[in-house]
């Protein structure tokens, strides 16, 4: 089948190769001329690795005519603008698969909520997310990876499962808990930032394990707030993606946290990076959410104080350690 990928960065270009491996015809849309040229020359947009039988264009109208299945692989902060253009130019109903992991800071919206707000019902056929522990650096090398396709319409999740699954290296599970999948996938980026800070400060594996455990508690609180399922927290988009993002040197969020821990500011890191670090934006959204609704998310609060208020690490850490005694979980 024909599939259009909206966004030709590391993950978008990698998924294009996955779909081509599965004998689908893929067109990648992006505005980055360098990405387009590399893909059309048979190279990955980011990695120095070949791509086979994939075309790319900067013409959104052509991209929308090419397929009625759109894979959304753009940063969350750009999602609203891209969807507005899609709504304006689409002539037929579309099905969407979101692979972007983040929360919109200005609204606290998950991507599914942005889609439902922007795309008219007459143009919105189906929606799913595709999440889980999946560094593009490994998937493009066809290393075994497991993901979860989540949709409120389980039959559509099953359809996406069949489209993306590859018998050699990619297995897709399904879930009807779309909300939980989206929340977990956004929060794990924030927890990876925090773990990077801990590593840079010389904390050991005991401390990192404690962060993961308490991070899972905060993840469950957020999923509950959004009316998702706790089981999702323990699944691929929750615990699975948290492990890979919080500990891997491939992780942009973990690496950014290390830089924060070494003394760099948020502004310095962003000025030096040419790739999206979703954890920074999601942190703002979750911090504002916990402030507005009085949620008990001490790790979120601490990370925000460190990164955006530039409070000394020692003071923030001491406040965490001096919190009242309580039972676990």
UniProtKB/Swiss-Prot annotation:
Catalyzes the reduction of the glycolytic intermediate dihydroxyacetone phosphate (DHAP) to sn-glycerol 3-phosphate (G3P), the key precursor for phospholipid synthesis. It catalyses: sn-glycerol 3-phosphate + NAD(+) = dihydroxyacetone phosphate + NADH + H(+); sn-glycerol 3-phosphate + NADP(+) = dihydroxyacetone phosphate + NADPH + H(+). Sn-glycerol 3-phosphate binds at residues 101, 132, 134, 188, 241, 251-253. Its main location: cytoplasm. This is Glycerol-3-phosphate dehydrogenase [NAD(P)+]. The keyword NAD applies. Keywords: Cytoplasm, Lipid biosynthesis, Lipid metabolism, NAD, NADP, Nucleotide-binding, Oxidoreductase, Phospholipid biosynthesis, Phospholipid metabolism. Belongs to the NAD-dependent glycerol-3-phosphate dehydrogenase family. GO terms for biological process: carbohydrate metabolic process; glycerol-3-phosphate biosynthetic process; glycerol-3-phosphate catabolic process; glycerophospholipid metabolic process; phospholipid biosynthetic process. The active site is at 188 (proton acceptor). Its EC number is 1.1.1.94. Pfam families: NAD_Gly3P_dh_C, NAD_Gly3P_dh_N. It is found in: Cytoplasm. NADPH binds at residues 11, 101, 136, 252, 276, 278.
């Amino acid at each position: 089948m024909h599939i259009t990928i909206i966004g030709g960065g590391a993950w978008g270009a990698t998924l294009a190769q996955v779909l081509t491996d599965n004998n689908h015809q893929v067109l990648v849309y992006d505005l980055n001329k360098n990405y387009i040229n590399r893909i059309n020359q048979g190279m990955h947009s980011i990695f120095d690795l070949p791509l086979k039988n994939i075309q790319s264009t900067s013409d959104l109208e052509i991209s929308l005519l090419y397929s009625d299945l759109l894979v959304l692989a753009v940063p969350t902060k750009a999602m609203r603008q891209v969807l507005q253009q899609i709504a304006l130019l689409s002539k037929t109903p579309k099905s969407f698969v979101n692979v972007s992991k983040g929360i919109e800071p200005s609204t606290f919206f998950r991507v599914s909520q942005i889609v439902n707000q922007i795309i008219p019902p007459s143009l919105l056929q189906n929606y799913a997310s595709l999440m889980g522990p999946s560094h593009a650096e490994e998937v493009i090398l066809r290393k075994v990876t497991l993901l979860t396709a989540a949709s409120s319409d389980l039959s559509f999740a099953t359809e996406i499962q069949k489209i993306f699954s590859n018998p050699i290296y990619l297995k897709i599970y399904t879930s009807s808990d779309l909300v939980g999948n989206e929340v977990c996938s956004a929060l794990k980026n924030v927890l990876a930032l925090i773990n990077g800070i801990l590593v840079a400060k010389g904390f050991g594996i005991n401390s990192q394990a404690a962060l993961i455990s308490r991070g899972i508690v905060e993840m469950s609180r957020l999923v509950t707030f959004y009316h998702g399922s706790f089981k999702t927290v323990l699944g691929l988009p929750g615990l699975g993606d948290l492990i890979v993002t919080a500990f891997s040197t491939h992780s942009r969020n973990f690496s950014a946290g290390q830089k924060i821990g070494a003394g760099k500011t948020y502004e310095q890191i962003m000025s030096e990076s040419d790739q999206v670090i979703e954890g920074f934006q999601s942190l703002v959204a979750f911090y504002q959410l916990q402030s507005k609704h009085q949620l008990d998310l001490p790790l979120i609060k601490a990370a925000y104080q460190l990164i955006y208020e530039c409070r000394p690490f020692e003071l923030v850490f001491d406040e965490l350690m001096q919190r009242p005694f309580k039972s676990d979980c």
